[in-house]
């Protein structure tokens, strides 16, 4: 019985959520089957990412995470679904946290919605901070700095090991497949 792969490749959006969700439903029928979540993503929707995190967290199957390439923004939260000793990254991968921004998807911004959007962002920050605190060795100060003040905080593989973000750095992905 081989390992089942769940890919989080590319942007985190509704399509990614649906893809992961259908795979999770399928895997609930075989809770003994090992799952590898392969991540190479620059992030995307915080809401969809938290949904993916929640789906994977309740999946009873044993989980491993492989960061191969970029793991940025909300993808970093998804990467924390497995126990630290089951989280891996390749040497050439990056892990980066950044501060959120107000959505500016349209040319003119309706400022009457700013308070609602800021309140929503603060709620998301609290949820993200709680996950980083419980799943890594990052200090509250470092998390606050990354989420609220820095435009981008990049972690090398060495720092990921030291801070409990990953448990092992792989020379080759063959080491886990």
Regions found by a protein language model. Give the residues of each.
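Terminal-region recognition feature
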Residues: 1-177
């Amino acid at each position: 019985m081989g390992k089942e792969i769940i890919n989080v490749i590319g942007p985190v959006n509704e399509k990614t959520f649906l893809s992961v969700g259908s795979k999770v439903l399928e895997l609930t029928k075989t809770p003994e089957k090992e799952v590898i979540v392969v991540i190479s993503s620059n992030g995307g929707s915080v809401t969809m990412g938290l949904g993916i995190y929640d789906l994977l967290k309740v999946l009873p199957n044993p989980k491993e995470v492989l960061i191969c390439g970029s793991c940025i923004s909300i993808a970093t939260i998804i990467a924390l679904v497995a126990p630290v000793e089951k989280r891996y990254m390749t040497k050439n991968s990056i892990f980066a946290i950044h501060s959120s921004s107000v959505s500016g998807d349209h040319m003119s911004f309706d400022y009457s919605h700013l308070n609602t959007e800021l309140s929503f962002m603060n709620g998301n920050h609290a949820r993200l901070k709680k996950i980083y605190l419980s799943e890594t060795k990052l200090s509250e100060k470092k998390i606050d700095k990354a989420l609220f003040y820095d435009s981008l905080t990049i972690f090398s593989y060495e720092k990921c090991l030291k801070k409990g973000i990953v448990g092992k750095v792989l020379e080759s992905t063959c080491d886990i497949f």
